[in-house]
Amino acid sequence: MNEKGFTLVEMLIVLFIISILLLITIPNVTKHNQTIQKKGCEGLQNMVKAQMTAFELDHEGQTPSLADLQSEGYVKKDAVCPNGKRIIITGGEVKVEH
């Protein structure tokens, strides 16, 4: 009988190799996801800072609150980072709420 196919041992070896590859790649994906969320939050902070500066230029140096930026159309919605933390303006500085 000359049947073509894989033996159980060959299948187990392939599954073992796939398992090892998954164990190597999953932590890297998680690490990159955290980095992406951090960079996204930094980008949002920089955007709000730029909009604050534009508001100050348009309103004779008046320091805006986040509500001012939203009501005037500088920021369209609540500033929330990809990780769920909110952007706040305190004392004229843009910060991430902890």
Curated annotation (Swiss-Prot):
Processing of ComGC in competent cells requires ComC, while stabilization, possibly by formation of a disulfide bond, requires BdbC and BdbD. GO terms for biological process: establishment of competence for transformation. The chain crosses the membrane at residues 6-26. It is a single-pass membrane protein. It is found in: Cell membrane; Cell surface; Fimbrium. Belongs to the ComGC family. This is Competence protein ComGC. It comes from Bacillus subtilis (strain 168). The gene is comGC.
